[in-house]
Amino acid sequence: MKVLLIKDVKNLGKAGEVKEVKDGYGKNFLIARGFAKLATPDVIEAWKKEQAKKAQEEAAEIEKLKQLKEKIESTKLVIKHKAGANGALFGAITNKEVAEELKKQGIEIDKKHIDIHPPIKQAGEYEIDVKLGHGIHAKLNLVVEAE
């Protein structure tokens, strides 16, 4: 029996491959557990269309993230924070504060995607890494001013 693998199956193959398997293994294990479908021409064609659609959506998502990266990298963010006489901040700048300031400028970024390392505890200029997904990273220019 020929089956189209929907998910990766150890010792058999990767998703999207058509494999010849024994009838019992195909019906009772692979198809029953949702790892595969019976490989008919209609099923194979539907799978190919679905994969093409997913690839197109992913390409659109990557393009959108690249545009967001350009917008972030062209932005200079200024945050005012209470500080002592020598420029040492009372507390550190958090990723939540950075996310809120970006939101005020019309850029929606989840605070989990903002990587501030080491913590910012001094007034000055910093470059912060923003992880956008799909391996795309943006560098945000941050200026911390003492209040």
UniProtKB/Swiss-Prot annotation:
InterPro entries: Ribosomal_bL9 (IPR000244), Ribosomal_bL9/RNase_H1_N (IPR009027), Ribosomal_bL9_bac/chp (IPR020594), Ribosomal_bL9_C (IPR020069), Ribosomal_bL9_C_sf (IPR036791), Ribosomal_bL9_N (IPR020070), Ribosomal_bL9_N_sf (IPR036935)
BP-aspect Gene Ontology terms: translation
One GO CC annotation: ribonucleoprotein complex
SUPFAM superfamilies (UniProt xref): L9 N-domain-like, Ribosomal protein L9 C-domain
GO molecular function ontology, one term from the record: rRNA binding
Keyword field: Ribonucleoprotein, Ribosomal protein, RNA-binding, rRNA-binding
Entry-linked Gene3D superfamilies: Ribosomal protein L9, C-terminal domain, Ribosomal protein L9, N-terminal domain
tRNA processing among keywords: no
A Pfam entry, by short name: Ribosomal_L9_N
Similarity comment: family membership: Belongs to the bacterial ribosomal protein bL9 family.
PANTHER family: 50S RIBOSOMAL PROTEIN L9 (PTHR21368)
Protein purpose: Binds to the 23S rRNA.
Identification of the protein by name: Large ribosomal subunit protein bL9
Species for this entry: Nitratiruptor sp. (strain SB155-2)
Gene giving rise to this polypeptide: rplI
